[in-house]
Amino acid sequence: MSQISPLYYGIIPARYGSSRLPGKPLIDIWGKPMFWYVYQNAVESNIFRSVVLATDSEEIAESAHQLSIPYVMTSVEHISGTDRVYEAAIKMNIEPDSVVVNIQGDEPLVKPEAIQQLVEPFIDVSIQVTTLSTRITANQAMLPHQVKVVVSSNGDALYFSRAAIPYLRDNDTDGYYLGHIGLYAFRMHTLDKFVHLPPSQLEQFEKLEQLRLLENNIPIRVVNTNHTSQGVDTVEDLEIVQGLLAQRMEAVSR
């Protein structure tokens, strides 16, 4: 195994439009916009050559400027955060063998340690894409919005699904389910290849863009972690995050 430590770049996609929470990245959480927490956690991982916000909104860009957070303006036409990350990466002239980390702008609780774990496999030059998983309960596995993943003996993803996989024939409720955490890292040349591939059949069935990689024989190394997060898609999610951040801040101030 050839080992070379690459350069890492963190890009946080932050679009203004959201069907359920318009202007989501700007939502105030204890005096700061949501994206500020994501940026701080990324910086605290201490792995990145640079961390930037990729946005389609002048309002988000102005807020980032006021907080001294670097940003890259991107198109309003992007269908996915990955496409937005790619445009920003191109504008940043990121080298082909460097690693681009897509850090979701609606994950204010993402742990620096989780980001560190995400990129650890890239010391192996054969690794092209990584993502995270964590153990979940059988009840959680039944929820379609909780994406599941099954992996091979070497840790590569075999499949991602909204269905409960693997199917437990003997109804073992304590079975081994892995929930997917939507944090990704790509070598730049693999990200370039990915965004230029047409959407795949399974991707369209499941509405999971990572299946495009698997259907085109691009392996995804899955790193299991105990550092779980909480995305913000609904008002209820926001209330949970506010409470958890309040607990963190209280713990730090003690």
UniProtKB/Swiss-Prot annotation:
Which cysteines link up through disulfide bonds?
none
Name where it's found.
Cytoplasm
Give an example GO molecular function.
3-deoxy-manno-octulosonate cytidylyltransferase activity
Query: What Gene3D superfamilies does this protein map onto?
Result: Spore Coat Polysaccharide Biosynthesis Protein SpsA, Chain A
Cellular component GO terms held in the UniProt record: cytosol
Q: What is its main location?
A: cytoplasm
Q: What is its EC number?
A: 2.7.7.38
For this UniProt record, give its keywords in alphabetical order, as a comma-separated list: Cytoplasm, Lipopolysaccharide biosynthesis, Nucleotidyltransferase, Transferase
What GO biological process terms does the UniProt entry carry, in alphabetical order? CMP-keto-3-deoxy-D-manno-octulosonic acid biosynthetic process; lipopolysaccharide biosynthetic process
Q: In which pathway does it act?
A: Nucleotide-sugar biosynthesis; CMP-3-deoxy-D-manno-octulosonate biosynthesis; CMP-3-deoxy-D-manno-octulosonate from 3-deoxy-D-manno-octulosonate and CTP: step 1/1
Question: Which top-rank group of organisms is this from?
Answer: Bacteria
Parts forming coiled coils: none
Q: Which of the seven top EC classes does this enzyme belong to?
A: transferase
List the catalysed reactions.
3-deoxy-alpha-D-manno-oct-2-ulosonate + CTP = CMP-3-deoxy-beta-D-manno-octulosonate + diphosphate
Concerning NCBIfam families, the annotation shows:
kdsB, PRK05450.1-3, PRK05450.1-5, PRK13368.1
Entry's family note: Belongs to the KdsB family.
- Annotated protein name in UniProt: 3-deoxy-manno-octulosonate cytidylyltransferase
- The encoding gene is kdsB
